[in-house]
Regions:
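Bacterial N-terminal signal peptides that target proteins for export
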Residues: 3-18
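C-terminal motif of bacterial Sec signal peptides marking the signal peptidase cleavage site
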Residues: 26-30
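Amphipathic/hydrophobic helical signal segments and adjacent flexible N-terminal regions
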Residues: 32-98, 213-238
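Generic short beta-strand segments
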Residues: 82-91, 124-126, 148-156, 165-167, ...
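N-terminal glycine/threonine-rich, aromatic-flanked beta-hairpin/loop signature
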Residues: 86-135
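Short, surface-exposed coil-to-beta transition loops
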Residues: 104-107, 131-136, 160-168, 180
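A short, structured loop/turn motif at beta-sheet edges
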Residues: 113-117, 138-146, 171-178
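Glycine-rich, aromatic-bearing surface loops/beta-hairpins
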Residues: 163-238
Length: 238
């Protein structure tokens, strides 16, 4: 009789232990599923940025002096802005003719349709990368008045194409952007043509008077806005 009772108690104990383990597993699975269904703002933004530029290339640009403004509460930056004098800050391109202090053609950027729910934003540019560059995906981070815009651009040149990351940071100040700075870096040169910078190479340039004021942006000269197309003077910044 005692042996039977012990066996029954052991069976009950094993059953309770199994139920406890199963409950923990189900709870963990439910939490994981819930996180996938309702990701945090940080998770949404991090994923979007990772789809644009690998972290190693973010690190490369910051080593060249580019500033990343993190956060999920960027200011609204819709508008068109002029970078003048658009001045080279640094480069990691061997024998680059564009040395620090070199003044490029004026840079123009148009930012529009900024979203506070998924941190997307549309962007058009002149004199940043080259002709017929297409923005594949964009994102914006920041907090307070400071922000960073991230764009992935497919640029065609000399019979091939490359994917570049184009980043721009600054501080919104009324209708202006203060301390505007831009960086480009080649993130995929697997289909490149001749005379194009290699993967991992890039440049950083800034607004030399530290104030990028509002400007008229003639989209007819840079492509079709509905397709989120970039275009600028060829070969200026690549």
């Amino acid at each position: 009789m005692m042996k039977k009772t012990t066996t029954e108690l052991t069976t009950v104990a094993k059953g309770c232990a199994f139920a406890l383990v199963l409950g923990v597993v189900l709870q963990f699975a439910a939490c994981s599923k819930n996180n996938n269904i309702n990701p945090s703002d940080e998770e949404i933004l991090t994923k979007k940025i990772e789809d644009i530029i690998p972290q190693k290339y973010v690190d490369s640009l910051t080593k060249l002096g580019f500033t990343i403004n993190k956060g999920t509460t960027p200011p609204n930056v819709d508008g068109a802005y002029l970078f003048k004098p658009f001045t080279i800050k640094n480069s990691n391109i061997p024998n680059d003719p564009y040395q620090p202090g070199y003044v490029l053609n004026d840079g123009l950027i148009k930012l529009y349709e900024q979203s506070t729910s998924d941190f997307s934003i549309k962007m058009l540019g002149k004199n940043f990368i080259g002709a017929a560059d297409t923005s594949v995906v964009t994102a914006i981070s920041g907090s307070g008045n400071k922000f960073t815009v991230y764009g992935k651009v497919k640029a065609y040149r000399n019979g091939g194409y490359n994917f570049y990351a184009f980043l721009m940071s600054g501080e919104k100040d009324g209708n202006n952007i203060k301390n505007g700075i831009a960086g480009i870096i080649n993130i995929d040169d697997s289909h490149t043509g001749p005379n194009t910078i290699a993967e991992g190479q890039g440049r950083v340039a800034f607004d030399g008077d530290y104030t990028s004021g509002p400007t008229d942006f003639n989209s007819k000269t840079v492509g079709i806005a509905e397709r989120n197309t970039f275009s600028s003077k060829p070969s200026q910044f690549k």
